[in-house]
Regions:
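Conserved class I S-adenosyl-L-methionine
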Residues: 1-12
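Short coil/turn segments at secondary-structure boundaries
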Residues: 9, 31-34
Length: 195
């Protein structure tokens, strides 16, 4: 995989998608998508590329998948596989069916061999449910936690990559990742390949 579409990227931090991808393959192309003006300001300053690759930022909205794909085609070759990343973003879409439809429309514009990566907080503990309710009552942009089965439903029609839909720290853990950390995380993730 040499092309990545990171939808709902949020504020740049350490080891952003382009840094990790271009460290492994300097010719990788990455497109970040968000609609937050604060993210845009930081992205413009911090998201640079290797000379061999390309990194771009789109001021675009998850709710318009076709416009996202059209704009991304300025940097990515959409006739070749793309890694679509939607990390901790779908929780902002209140209606589950609408969230699934947005994912389906994005994947429909990508060729066979593309991969979908999703992670989101889940309604797997009373503490997380209470925290979500308090956050949503605060006036912030709401974030809805979902059952694990709904996270898994985003991958319908795709070939799940092992180990499937699991808690984030359990997805290919490194030698220093402990079971204790996994037990404390109310976020699940998965990777699916478009056949």
């Amino acid at each position: 995989m040499r092309q990545f579409l990171d939808v709902g990227t949020g504020l740049p931090t350490a080891d952003n998608t382009h840094e990790v991808a271009q460290r492994v393959a300097p010719d990788s192309r990455i497109v970040y998508v968000d609609n937050d003006p604060i993210v845009l300001a930081h992205a413009s300053a911090l998201l640079t590329s290797t000379p061999e690759g390309r990194t771009a930022y789109l001021d675009a909205d998850l709710y318009d998948p076709e416009a996202v794909l059209k704009a991304a085609a300025g940097t990515l070759d959409l006739s070749r596989p793309v890694g679509l990343m939607i990390l901790n973003t779908l929780g902002h879409v209140a209606e589950y069916d609408r969230a699934r439809e947005l994912v389906r429309r994005l994947m429909a514009g990508l060729p066979a061999g593309s991969h979908l990566v999703i992670s989101d907080s889940t309604a797997t503990s009373e503490g997380m449910i209470a925290a979500s309710e308090a956050y949503n009552a605060s006036g912030a942009v709401p974030y809805y936690v979902r059952p694990v089965a709904e996270i898994a439903g985003f991958f319908d029609g795709l070939e799940l990559v092992e180990p499937g839909v699991v808690r984030v720290p359990e997805w290919r853990p490194g030698p220093s990742d402990g079971v204790e950390a996994a037990a404390a995380v109310d976020a699940y993730c998965g990777v699916g390949r478009k056949p």
